[in-house]
């Protein structure tokens, strides 16, 4: 306790009546717990502290030790290094307090060296463990800091000489002065010392070769010689050890120059109740020694005789009273060495570990600050009064509490810690502390099962801080059990994974995988035997390896090349791993044997929903037939993953499937490999036996999925057991060129079917083909089943959402609803609505359906019809057009008159990822669903190549119950592939067509028919012009040749059957749409052949007789040809009047086409229109960009890329800006859709101004959010073009976008160093605008204020400054700037600008009075200027 200072009032000393406070500042005992002043008592009270003045001299009658209340700010205190790390020291202070010292608090020289080390120069850097040792005595300035979150006060101790010696003056330095200095510079002949004393230069010569100090290191120094001057003094010093810091009594008379840690002579004058009172420096200063600071810990006060001198070390000096507090313990030891302080003859006592329990601790006395104990007969301990008081709540009696601590009584205590200055152990007898099993880290081992209690959320690790008994723990994000709600105060059963002694913390996990019985945890390298299986957690996933973490921080690497199968991993995945090899602390892992085989269908429980997919758990009986405690069969749990792509065959249903499979739900999943399962493959594996290597035969069609895909080769994993090799398929072998330059996009886990071409038994390899014609028969009924499965999956998702009471599940496709308009999406221009009566469900009207319509008013209500439902995002895709509302009805079965019908006119309303939604033009019908792909291997989307959103097309139905259709051209193409030659007159299904004649007779008949047709058609051909060759309607025609019960298709060419080539020929040709009045030159049918048949023969082989009776556009081609010939004959005999009308009609048609093409405002919808646009404006980059955007909207990436190249070669080289626009577009495409960005960038830099290209690249990378690439580009730009002014604002803007706003100011300094002086002002102004743009108005004002101060005549800067302040709403600041501007001495034209700006400000934001004031000031300035001119 600090003694109260005596006041010295003017007029002499008034001796007041002596009063005593019976109040303890450390502990309050008694029933009332109030501080009450009482009269002094005769009997001695060991718990009360007398702090009175008994006489006229300034003195204290208590040698109380230091505490947080008596410790004053900036007070110099001695400390001892108790713990140290590379970057911080923990220092023990008097009073059992602790302080921390950081790197920046050592010395200015060490701070400089540390900064250099951070920049890469580590030549002079040594961490704190090299500069300090445990037990090292230091002194420094104490600084109190309060933590904002807890309010607790902690201490920092600054050892910097400038802070410690800042109040000393160089003229007062004498020979023999001892201080702590830092090495500022190491020279050949000695060290320059950083003393911190004003005006003092210190130097230490290298007298001893073994002496080696580092720059920044602190050392105790003693002044050997000193030379004083008026403004500066120099001294030579020698280094001394901490046990040689003695100061002679006659040397120093100023207490400020006796620094803590110094050794002085202490003369005992009086025994106090809690220590010794005496004096130092020949009785010049009063000094005190607390009873806990005696030479030996167990010494008593009676051992020190009065008027005797003892060596003592200065602990601290109270700043106001100048009372000195000392310790007689000169040889301060750490806890490990405390037991060796006994006599040599006595046996050494083992030190007590912190956290251990002492069963019989004997009470010696009630001392100052607590109950003094004797531990293990030789060591000293103390139970603080605060600890005793904490055991009681409410009122209690002091005497009763302390009565149990009578002399020689014994107590069971736990060691809490050791104080190196007082040489004692501080303890606790609290039963909760003593009986706690888990008190310190030594009580916990990795692998233990413990109960942890959550006490705080840790956002840094995205986990929780927990407490296990009295030990702190961390529950990291990777080790959190999924689907568990966490709250502060919650208790969790956890497994200890790591015990970190350095951080004094342990890491735990409550995942079910770690809590299972019999789980093996790898906790030390000695147990890591090859072949053992341990539970581990994936902490990092890379392309070539997976990093796995076990217990106690042990890590292992799982190389993907060591895996037999392509296993998928994700960060946080916890599973078992087998040790493959170990080399010291390097562990290589592999996976244990598979629990499940390929195709095995298992009941799984969804445990967690991840970004990568669904985490599942499978529970099954253990293989060793063990039983649990209740006698039930022991169960094992296996954890796996269903990747996102394996939830469904259709991309748009993946996230919807995740919604209907929440955590805790159960379902069936098929094993694909090791721990990877699939939902989409369950129907396939449940419907047939899974093939293995022995059962695979050439010709089999097998399911597979993409493992890896490049532009050239695709790696496929086939679903064959015991065959783990990927099979390679060339991308060109997948294409049929059904759509020219159609992009091929293959992603991992994508489904493909393959046909086995060969099987090599010796090498155990399969050769396969994934070409569409190899794996698909061309039967459109298979396509119909594919779409039917898609619709069934959508229905299942809807049913699952209905069970979860999701609002979106109430709606159906084709249903009419009322919606409320909410606005237009700025990115997609789609119209956004909400459903009336259900605000949780939003509706979307796509911009392609909006057309040129004007947006309605906000909040207006409209009627709409649902076109499709996006269950993954709770969005209804709607149409508000009256025709769609009238023509669309809810879903139902297909009417009988539409079964198999073709040529129906329909409008494409939506084009989704898997299907296109169409509406029939006539009548009220449900929506028609068209597949995007005819088959999973239809990678070119040939089934929907002609479908464009918003266009009309002809469709043909391919399902007999559902509204499923394909474009008519696709239907005719694949129908023609299937028909035989004998049934060409009328379409016949292939399975029921029976031809009795032999192949040879069949060929003869066809040739005869062809010859007859040629003769009959010869006259007609000669009468017509031969300038045009009109193609037939059919793209390809084949004849089915029946041999030994098997069908073989062979193409027909001019009526002659050709041999089928060995390889499959192209089924698609890029022909234009057939003309309506096409003239057939093939021998398949003609008018004469139709007449030679008996009635009904044409439909004899057909299944559906009604098909031949329908008079729609799906009639047979033979009938169309006959009608065409008759119509052609009639047209030859047109009258003159009919010819004139036909010419007029044709002229009108051509005029309409020309007007439409000439209208610049017309919406471009076809490639021909865009071609005309770019031909008309070849140097206009906007036209080319519109064309490219049109192609990209149709996912024709290659065409768009080629068009950009074509534009670059077409635009004139003089149009540099237009060319730059095209290069920017090409770079943007390569960045988004390809991986050739760097190559295209090099090409662009060679063909354009590099600076312009780099600036465009920065914008492109920002728009595409490529932060990593942007940083490297900025580095390149700033190095290459640092003398260009334009570069720096662009880089600053990018820094703001990257979130590096703190580095913008450094960037400005770099810019000013690199740019010439004349460009400094524009650069500063640009940066100021950027600061203002990003709401950092203070920095912007600072920059502009400096400019206008230095260059007051720059009117443009004044204007920018004022405009910026007005825009930020800082009107008063803008007014102050203008008031500064108008007092400048400027020319009239410049002053006119200033006053106009001033007047405009007051008119807009001021009052009439301020406006009048500005006008008056302007008039006055004009008058004054006129006088000066005269």
Curated annotation (Swiss-Prot):
Compartments (UniProt record): Nucleus, Nucleolus
Residue numbers spanned by region Disordered: 1041-1145
UniProt KW Acetylation keyword: no
UniProt entry keywords in alphabetical sequence: Coiled coil, Nucleus, Repeat, Ribosome biogenesis, rRNA processing
SMART domains: HAT (SM00386), S1 (SM00316)
Residue runs in coiled coils: 1119-1157
Bias (Polar residues): 1043-1053
InterPro entries named in the record: HAT, HAT_Syf1_CNRKL1_C, NA-bd_OB-fold, Rrp5, Rrp5_S1_rpt_hs1_sc1, S1_domain, TPR-like_helical_dom_sf
Superkingdom as given in the UniProt entry: Eukaryota
Residue ranges of domain S1 motif in the record: 74-160, 176-238, 261-329, 447-511, 531-592, 697-771
PANTHER family per record: PROGRAMMED CELL DEATH PROTEIN 11 PRE-RRNA PROCESSING PROTEIN RRP5 (PTHR23270), PROTEIN RRP5 HOMOLOG (PTHR23270:SF10)
Function summary: Involved in rRNA processing or maturation during ribosome biogenesis.
Protein name: rRNA biogenesis protein RRP5
Organism: Drosophila melanogaster (Fruit fly)
Encoding gene, per UniProt annotation: Rrp5
């Amino acid at each position: 306790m600090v003694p109260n200072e005596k006041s010295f009032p003017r007029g002499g000393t008034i001796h007041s009546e002596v009063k005593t406070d019976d109040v303890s500042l450390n502990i309050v005992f008694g029933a009332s717990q109030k501080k009450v002043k009482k009269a002094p008592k005769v009997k001695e009270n060991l718990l009360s502290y007398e702090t009175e003045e008994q006489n006229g001299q300034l003195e204290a009658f208590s040698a109380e030790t230091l505490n947080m209340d008596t410790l004053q700010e900036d007070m110099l205190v001695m400390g001892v290094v108790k713990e140290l790390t590379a970057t911080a020291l923990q220092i023990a202070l008097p009073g059992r307090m602790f302080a921390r010292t950081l790197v920046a608090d050592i010395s200015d020289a060490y701070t400089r060296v540390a900064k250099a080390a951070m920049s890469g120069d580590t030549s002079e850097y040594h961490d704190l463990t090299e500069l300090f040792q445990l037990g090292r005595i230091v002194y420094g300035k104490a600084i109190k800091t309060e933590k904002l979150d807890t309010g607790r006060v902690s201490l920092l101790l600054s050892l910097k000489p400038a802070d410690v010696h800042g109040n000393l003056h160089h003229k007062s330095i004498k020979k023999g002065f001892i201080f702590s200095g830092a090495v500022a510079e190491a020279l050949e002949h000695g060290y320059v010392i950083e003393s911190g004393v004003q005006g003092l230069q210190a130097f230490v010569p290298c007298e001893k070769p073994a002496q080696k100090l580092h720059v920044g290191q602190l050392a105790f120094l003693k002044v050997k010689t000193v030379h004083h001057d008026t403004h500066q003094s120099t001294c030579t010093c020698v280094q001394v050890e901490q046990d040689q810091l003695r100061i002679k009594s006659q040397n120093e008379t100023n207490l400020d120059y006796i620094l803590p840690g110094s050794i002085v002579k202490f003369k005992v004058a009086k025994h106090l109740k809690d220590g010794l009172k005496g004096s130092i420096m020949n009785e010049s200063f009063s000094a005190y020694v607390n009873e806990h600071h005696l030479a030996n810990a167990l010494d008593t006060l009676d051992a020190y005789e009065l008027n005797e001198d003892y060596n003592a070390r200065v602990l601290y000096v109270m700043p106001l009273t100048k009372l000195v507090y000392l310790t007689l313990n000169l040889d301060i030891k750490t806890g490990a060495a405390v037991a060796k302080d006994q006599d040599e003859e006595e046996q050494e006592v083992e030190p007590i570990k912190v956290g251990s329990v002492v069963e019989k601790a004997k009470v010696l006395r009630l001392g100052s600050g607590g109950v003094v104990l004797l531990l293990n007969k030789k060591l000293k301990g103390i139970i603080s009064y605060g600890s005793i008081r904490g055991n009681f709540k409410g009122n209690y009696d002091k005497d009763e509490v302390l009565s149990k601590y009578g002399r020689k009584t014994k107590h069971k205590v736990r060691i809490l810690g050791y104080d190196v200055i007082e040489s004692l152990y501080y303890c606790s007898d609290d039963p909760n502390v003593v009986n706690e099993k888990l008190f310190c880290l030594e009580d916990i081992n990795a692998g233990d099962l413990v109960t942890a209690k959550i006490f705080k959320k840790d956002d840094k690790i995205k986990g929780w801080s927990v407490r296990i008994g009295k030990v702190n723990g961390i529950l990291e994000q990777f080790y959190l059990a999924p689907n568990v709600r966490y709250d502060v105060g919650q208790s969790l059963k956890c497994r200890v994974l790591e015990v970190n002694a350095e951080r004094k913390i342990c890491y735990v996990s409550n995942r079910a995988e770690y809590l299972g019985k019999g789980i093996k945890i790898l906790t030390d390298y000695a147990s890591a035997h090859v072949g053992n299986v341990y539970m581990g957690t994936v902490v990092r996933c890379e392309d070539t390896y997976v990093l796995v973490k076990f217990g106690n921080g042990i890590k292992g690497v799982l190389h993907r090349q060591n895996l037999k199968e392509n296993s998928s991993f994700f960060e946080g995945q916890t599973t078992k791993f087998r040790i493959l090899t170990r080399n010291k602390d390097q562990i290589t892992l592999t996976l244990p044997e598979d629990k499940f085989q390929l195709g095995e269908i298992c009941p799984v429980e969804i445990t967690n929903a991840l970004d990568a997919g669904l985490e599942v758990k499978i529970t099954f009986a253990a293989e060793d037939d063990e039983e649990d405690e209740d006698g039930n069969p022991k169960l094992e749990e296996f954890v796996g993953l269903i990747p996102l792509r394996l939830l469904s065959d259709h991309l748009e249903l993946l996230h919807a499937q995740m919604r209907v499979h929440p955590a805790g739900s159960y379902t069936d999943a098929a094993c694909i490999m090791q721990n990877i399962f699939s939902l989409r493959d369950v129907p396939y594996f449940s419907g047939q036996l899974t093939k293995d290597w022995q059962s695979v035969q050439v010709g089999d069609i097998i399911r597979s999925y993409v493992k890896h895909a490049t532009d050239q080769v695709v790696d496929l994993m086939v679903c064959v057991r015991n065959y783990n090799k990927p099979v390679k398929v060339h991308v060109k072998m997948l294409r049929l060129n059904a759509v020219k330059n159609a992009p091929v996009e293959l992603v991992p886990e994508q489904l493909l079917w393959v046909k086995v071409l060969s099987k090599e038994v010796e090498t155990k390899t399969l050769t396969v083909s994934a070409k569409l014609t190899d794996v698909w028969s061309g039967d459109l009924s298979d396509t119909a089943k594919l779409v039917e499965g898609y619709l069934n999956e959508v229905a299942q998702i809807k049913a699952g959402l209905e069970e979860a009471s999701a609002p979106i599940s109430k709606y159906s496709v084709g249903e009419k609803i009322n919606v409320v308009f909410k606005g237009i999406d700025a990115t997609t221009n789609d119209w956004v609505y909400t459903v009336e009566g259900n605000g949780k469900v939003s509706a979307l009207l796509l911009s392609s359906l909006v057309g040129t319509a004007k947006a309605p008013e906000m909040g207006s209500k409209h009627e709409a019809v649902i076109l499709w439902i996006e269950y993954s995002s709770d969005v209804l895709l709607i149409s508000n057009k009256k025709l769609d509302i009238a023509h669309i009805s809810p879903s139902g079965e297909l009417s009988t008159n539409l079964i198999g019908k073709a040529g129906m006119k329909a409008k494409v309303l939506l084009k989704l990822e898997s299907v296109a939604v169409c509406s029939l033009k006539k009548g009220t019908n449900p929506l028609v669903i068209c597949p995007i792909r005819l088959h999973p291997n239809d990678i070119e989307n040939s089934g929907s190549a002609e479908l464009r959103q918003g266009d009309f097309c002809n469709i043909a139905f391919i399902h007999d119950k559902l509204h499923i259709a394909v474009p008519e051209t696709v239907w005719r193409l694949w129908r023609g592939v299937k028909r035989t030659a004998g049934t060409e007159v009328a379409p016949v299904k292939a399975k029921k067509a029976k031809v009795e004649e032999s192949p040879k007779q069949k060929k003869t008949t066809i040739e005869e028919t062809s010859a007859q047709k040629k003769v009959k058609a010869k006259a007609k051909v000669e009468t017509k012009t031969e300038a045009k060759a009109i193609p037939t309607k059919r793209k390809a025609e084949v004849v089915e040749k029946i041999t030994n019960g098997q069908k073989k298709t062979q193409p027909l060419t001019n009526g002659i059957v050709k041999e089928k080539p060995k390889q499959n020929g192209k089924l698609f040709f890029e022909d234009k749409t057939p003309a309506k009045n096409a003239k057939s030159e093939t021998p398949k049918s003609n008018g004469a052949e139709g007449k030679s048949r008996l009635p009904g023969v044409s439909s004899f082989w057909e299944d559906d007789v009604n098909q031949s009776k329908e008079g729609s556009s799906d009639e047979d081609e033979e009938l169309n040809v006959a009608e065409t010939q008759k119509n052609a004959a009639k047209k030859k005999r047109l009258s003159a009047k009919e010819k004139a009308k036909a010419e007029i009609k044709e002229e009108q048609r051509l005029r309409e086409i020309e007007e439409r093409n000439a209208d610049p405002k017309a919406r471009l919808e076809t490639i021909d229109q865009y071609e005309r646009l770019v031909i008309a404006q070849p140097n206009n980059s906007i036209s080319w960009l519109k064309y490219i955007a049109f192609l990209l909207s149709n996912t024709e990436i290659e065409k768009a890329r080629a068009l950009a190249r074509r534009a670059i070669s077409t635009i004139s080289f003089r149009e540099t800006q237009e060319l730059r626009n095209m290069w920017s577009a090409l770079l943007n495409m390569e960045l988004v859709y390809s991986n050739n960005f760097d190559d295209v960038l090099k090409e662009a830099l060679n063909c354009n101004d590099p600076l312009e290209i780099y600036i465009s690249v920065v914008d492109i990378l920002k728009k595409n959010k490529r932060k990593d690439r942007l940083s490297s580009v900025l580095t390149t730009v700033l190095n290459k073009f640092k003398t260009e002014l334009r570069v720096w604002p662009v880089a600053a803007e990018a820094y703001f976008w990257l979130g590096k706003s703190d580095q913008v100011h450094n960037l400005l300094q770099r810019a000013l160093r690199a740019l010439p002086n004349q460009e400094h002002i524009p650069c500063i102004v640009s940066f100021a605008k950027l600061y203002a743009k990003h709401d950092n108005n203070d920095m912007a004002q600072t920059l502009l204020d400096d400019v206008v101060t230095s260059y007051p005549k720059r009117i443009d800067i004044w204007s920018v400054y004022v405009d910026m302040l007005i825009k930020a709403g800082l009107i008063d600041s803008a007014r102050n700037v203008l008031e500064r501007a108008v007092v400048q001495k400027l020319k009239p034209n410049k002053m006119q600008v200033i006053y106009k700006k001033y007047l405009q400000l007051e008119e807009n934001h001021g009052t009439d009075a301020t406006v009048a004031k500005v006008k008056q000031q302007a008039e006055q300035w004009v008058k004054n200027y006129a006088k000066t001119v005269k």
